[in-house]
Regions:
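Phosphate-handling DNA/RNA-contact segment within nucleic-acid enzymes
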Residues: 1-145, 161-162
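A charged alpha-helical hairpin associated with nucleic-acid processing machineries
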Residues: 38-39, 82-89, 105, 127-289
Length: 289
């Protein structure tokens, strides 16, 4: 144990007390480890991926919160990516370790991961909280850029993470764009399937208004009355989040034209616009639920 006491190993989150008697066991046994560093290049925790495809435990686990590790204040790979983020002017934000590693190996250096898996119980690996972008992580990114590009998984959980990421980025007065993956279930797979296309999709990331319109009109039949109602409901909610009144006005007019409905009706149905935001980045504004 390299001279550390059992209590210190447990407090550091790398070991757990045995339930079968005295002693401890390795929290990350039989797992591939991903060291997690803070922005000052100090190792503060680990992520672990199971090596057994038939394992009943969770595929990924993270270190628990400790005296030196709080997942809300750490972004995986930010210690290496921060200079590239400054140079490019934006950060690509993904969900997991492998998303970062595959992208980094492919030459995409301004990339970080939220890596938000957390154990509900120290001993029950099958119970997990969902991954998600945290407001503190957004504040951390704002030190290095004024724009983020969200590139989360293509499943429902990834879509939910994108929606929350949009709200948090707007709350922090950051520009936010969405990378719409046309291949692969996640950035890791997309980078390995067709790197050129993946890089193009990052470069051509869509502003949130454009992304919302593209997504809705792809899924909803707006030729029907019910389809028009569904599209209007979703897109008006998205438009209401836009902080710029000129941008909101532009998209309301566009929606009226695309749905062939009266602009006045849409304006009457528009949720209340966001309240003026404070310039103090440390204060959470009304966009954060």
């Amino acid at each position: 144990n390299k001279g550390f006491s059992l209590e210190e190993l447990i407090a550091a989150g790398v070991a757990l007390k045995s339930e079968r008697g005295p002693g401890i066991y390795d929290r990350f046994r039989d797992r591939l480890l991903f060291p997690i560093f803070d922005v000052q290049d100090r190792a503060v925790g680990f992520g672990g991926r199971t090596l057994d495809p038939n394992a009943k435990e969770a595929k990924y686990i993270n270190s628990p919160q400790t005296a030196i590790y709080n997942k809300s204040f750490v972004l995986y790979n930010l210690n290496q990516a921060k200079s590239f983020i400054k140079d490019s002017g934006y950060a690509v934000v993904v969900e997991g370790y492998m998303d970062v590693i595959s992208s980094w190996q492919a030459g995409i250096k301004n990339i970080v991961a939220v890596s938000g898996t957390a154990l509900v119980s120290e001993t029950n690996y099958s119970k997990e909280e969902g991954s998600g972008f945290k407001y503190e992580q957004v504040k951390l990114l704002k030190r290095y850029c004024n724009e983020i590009r969200l590139c989360f998984d293509a499943d429902l959980a990834g879509q939910s993470a994108s929606e929350r990421g949009i709200d948090l980025a707007l709350a922090a007065e950051l520009e936010v764009k969405i990378v719409a993956l046309s291949q692969g279930k996640d950035p890791d797979e997309a980078a390995r399937m067709n790197l050129v296309k993946f890089k193009q999709e990052i470069e051509q990331a869509l502003p949130i208004g454009e992304y919302a319109f593209k997504s809705v009109f792809k899924k909803v039949d707006v030729k029907t009355r019910e389809g028009k109602k569904q599209a209007a409901k979703f897109l008006l909610a998205a438009i209401a989040k836009l902080p710029d009144p000129v941008e909101r006005d532009f998209y309301i007019k566009r929606l009226a034209r695309d749905l062939d409905v009266e602009e006045k009706s849409l304006r009457e149905s528009l949720p209340n616009p966001p309240k003026p935001r404070t310039n103090a980045i440390g204060k959470v504004n009304c966009l954060v639920n």
